[in-house]
Amino acid sequence: SGTAAANYYPAICEANISHVPLVVLTTDRPHELRQVGAPQAMDQLQMYQNHVKLFVEMALPEATEEMLNYAYWQGAKGAAFAQQTPAAPVHLNFPLREPLLPDLERKTKSSQQTALFAGQSILSTEQVQQLADQWYQKNGVLVVGGSHTEEEAALFIQLAEALQWPLLADPLANIVTHGQNSEVVIAHSDLFLNVATLPQEPEVVLRFGSLPISKNIMLWLKRLATTETAFYFVDENGQWQEQLKKSQTVIQAKETTFVEQLLTVVKPTEATWLAQWLLLEKTVSEVLLETLNATELNETTASLAVHQTMKENGQLFVSNSMAIRYLDRFMDSRPYRMFGNRGINGIDGIVSTALGMSAVAPTQQNVLLIGDLALYHDMNGLFLAKRYQLPLTIVLLNNNGGGIFSFLSQRTLREDDFEPLFGTPLDLDFSLVAELYGASYQEVKTIAELKQILQTAAEEPQFQVIEVKGNRQENVHLYESILAEIGRRVERQGISWNG
């Protein structure tokens, strides 16, 4: 209740945008103690506003059959509402009078059960065929955002293969991680889109869900939206969350069912279309292999080491800001599951959410890749690992501040202005943080040392913090040098480079 309930706010906002079905229960003062100056009382009616899809002010409890039925029905209704498309949080607020404890010896009837039958949005066979006909022999691109399971990722890959279209995806879609046997998955498009001029432009863009994290994909699509390219947007949640606002066709259907329908009717386009993408992907992959293998331990190579040491079916939670971008730019295909909070893209609650991931599968390999600011923001979340003995390996990328702003226009400010406003150095000793919460701690100096610790942790899970100290300016220099080398090689292939 009170400010404790207010502390749920960031999680509820994230769950709303990420379409996580969450039931939030808060306690409250009874009505006669509200707005009269009673202690520990605040207005909790609609306290989460439009970030929840349902709010219920529960009745005061009574030990009657009618009230038990009421409580059951509101609980069932709340759980059902949370799961209905679009999935989102619901809030039930419970006012309580003293005595606050019920009669625990009192016998009550067994809880009733309510079965819920719900349909899903499905296109007709004629509608699916009409779309397939519109795409026949067209050069297209699949763009997939959002978070997906391995099975869902496999369906998107099958569709791209059936069409012979390149597939661009957000890292959390788990398409890159599970696309190791498919050439249609373009893992490194962020490093060439919007700067390399493709010999052919797509005639069709088929989008599923939110835009991927890549800014270059977004800018490229934004430019295409001013051309003759036809945009199709699959809107599973029926909310028209289309950032570009340029789609000529909106398809309201359950994504996986729609893809399964398409697989029965679509035909492949000419092989030359995919070939130009494969050439660019091959060029970028070669540059990354040569450059990063010759680079000492830093934030980028540490992120790749985490990626490369993930076991099949392992679980990696990736923080926002730079951690997710390192993987989006540089990772290749590996069969593990990646998680993150990409609804609002904030750094609140990253540690707690990662520990929730670990709690679901504590015997699996569980790793968190996080920066120092994000760890500091949710430091108290580490207590969950100690309290519930959750074996999470935390790889801390510590560049003493907010690294993302060193890649943005703010970096041109004077250091005296940049550091307190955007760099925001913490100067914290994280070995003491680890000690406080009962985690083992190691600072690593080499890639080999980091990989060895991660491989051991994969076989013998434990709660530990592995710190990699980095330098913000070095990260920017490495990124820019990689782009420059990619540009040189691409231009030698006769492709214009505007980087």
Predicted regions and their residues:
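Conserved thiamine diphosphate
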Residues: 1-65, 70-72, 76-93, 98, ...
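Structural signature of the thiamine diphosphate
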Residues: 17-19, 53-109, 197-226, 230, ...
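Thiamine diphosphate
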Residues: 25, 32-45, 329-499
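Glycine-rich, acidic loop regions that bind phosphate or pyrophosphate groups
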Residues: 26-73, 170-280, 467
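Glycine-rich phosphate/diphosphate-binding loops that line cofactor/substrate pockets in enzymes
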Residues: 79-86, 127-141, 159, 199, ...
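Structural motif
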Residues: 140, 204, 315, 365-367
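Glycine-rich, anion-gripping cofactor-binding loops and their flanking helix/strand elements
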Residues: 145-232, 240, 333-363, 377-379, ...
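Active-site diphosphate/adenylate-binding microenvironment
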Residues: 278-363
